[in-house]
């Protein structure tokens, strides 16, 4: 029987770091620390959650994470609330295709409220994967108090 491959040193360090951050509320402490210069607002924008997170999402996310970290280190409070109000049109196009809709009247017959709820549910299909990957790339975002 083949031996199970052991985790690399990098993978073990990642797990240790994430565990330390979580057990010691490091992100929470960074957000709650004194902010003598007041609040700095950073509008991150939601992910394109039309599928699983991929390299392009991760690169953009890492770059965007640098801005609130910089301003936090400069003495500002920078809230980092994650959100799921995901770019309506791409999600709507996916849902229309899944439901076989060709025209606006199809949406009206289906019901606008019901269509909107179906779109919202479609966005949240991948929420769990996003909630796993964002901390793993070292990004600090408040996903527990997210907005939908």
How would you describe each model-predicted region?
Residues 1-148:
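N-terminal, positively charged nucleic-acid-binding surface of large information/translation enzymes
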């Amino acid at each position: 029987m083949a031996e199970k491959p052991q985790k690399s040193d990098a993978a073990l360090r990642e797990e240790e770091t994430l565990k330390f951050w979580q057990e010691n509320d490091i992100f929470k402490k960074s957000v709650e620390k004194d902010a003598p210069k007041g609040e700095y607002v950073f509008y991150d924008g939601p992910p394109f959650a039309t599928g699983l997170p991929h390299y392009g999402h991760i690169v953009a996310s890492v770059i965007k994470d640098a801005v609130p970290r910089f301003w936090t280190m400069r003495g500002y409070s920078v809230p980092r609330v994650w959100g799921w109000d995901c770019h309506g049109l791409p999600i709507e196009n996916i849902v229309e295709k899944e439901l076989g809709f060709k025209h606006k009247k199809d949406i009206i017959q289906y019901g606008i409220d019901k269509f909107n709820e179906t779109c919202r549910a479609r966005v949240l299909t991948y929420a769990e994967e996003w909630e796993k990957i964002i901390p793993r790339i070292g990004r600090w975002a408040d996903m527990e108090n997210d907005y939908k």
